[in-house]
Amino acid sequence: EAGTIIDGLQTTYSDYKVIKVEFYIHFSSTSTGYAGFQFKAGGSWITSPGYHSQCEYGRHHSQSNLTQDTNSNSSITINEDSNDRCENITGTLAWHRGPNSEDAMLTWDAKGMAYSGANYDFLLFNGAGGEAGTRNNTIEGIRWKNSSNSNLWWKVIGMK
């Protein structure tokens, strides 16, 4: 695990309206891997595949082409065969809190680069989400979730 991005959204950081993070992911081998994030609510990190509980960017060998797969747990995945290697993903994610208690959301924008034989393919990802059954204003934290063959660098670039 690459660590906790932020914990204490309802306590230590409750006065902040926007928290923005920049990240870069590199997959170091051709085996299946992933990198993404999870939410904390009710005092626990949500690890089950609940709707919008996690977002993943990954490299998999399950299909023969590059696709974006948005499924019931809000994972965003790059599927690839042995000739399509998604090696680099970069982007930002941000936590936004509005004036009302229910006006909170996480957004992300990312770009991926995949090499397929002699060509480079570029993919765009974006989305917004929260945790099913949990009001977004009660989300307490956000942390990274990644496999051992993914290298993940990140930095908080703004808090307001």
Language-model region placement:
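Surface-exposed molecular-recognition determinants
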Residues: 1-160
